[in-house]
Amino acid sequence: MGSNYPAATSRSAELHDRGKSVIPDGVSRSTVIIRPHPIYVDHAQGAWVTDVDGNRYLDCNNNFTSIILGHADPKIESAVRKQLASGTAFSMATESEIQLAELLCDRVASCEQIRFCNSGTEAVMGAIKAARAFTERPAIIKVEGSYHGTYDHAEASLGSDPSNWGLPNRPMTIPYASGAPGSLTD
């Protein structure tokens, strides 16, 4: 680790030890596991994240691009507060979902309709199912080394390198986690 990485005696290290007693590996997402311990965030503003030890980082990840407008943007905060006052997470349809779909379809020429999902993983699962139905083919391709959520058939070859790529006409599929189905590598 670099000299700026929080030390083993840091607050991040303490939180990691504490978290391991109630959360596997001490964090709620496997994508943030870093050895010897993850960096725990205290707060963020704009493009900058500050950890629990007071170290400041430029956030180039932006929660895997879901925070493209930056953290704690005043306009976003205002819109969220306004919606909170009206209620959230209805299990019924709302006009706002139609308004957002119309806005997106108007701005993206190739988009005729849109389906909203609860997570990127759920969106990938739906996209794979739709692709299989449309093409009537069982196999899919995926960007090598890229993260596409935690769905079994997308959570593969995340840590690949030239030593395990396989042949150009027969690439290797490397399961990312234990419990991946055997069909993943068939």
Role assignments for model-derived ranges:
Residues 50, 69-70, 156-157:
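Short beta-strand-to-turn element immediately C-terminal to the catalytic PLP-Schiff-base lysine
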Residues 9, 13, 43, 70, ...:
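Electropositive phosphate-/nucleotide-binding environments in soluble metabolic enzymes
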Residues 102-186:
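PLP-dependent aspartate aminotransferase-fold enzymes
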Residues 38-61:
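Active-site and channel-lining beta-strand-loop segments
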Residues 2-43:
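Active-site-adjacent loop/helix segments that line or gate small-molecule/cofactor pockets in enzymes
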Residues 23, 29-30, 37, 63-65, ...:
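Glycine-rich, flexible loop/turn motifs
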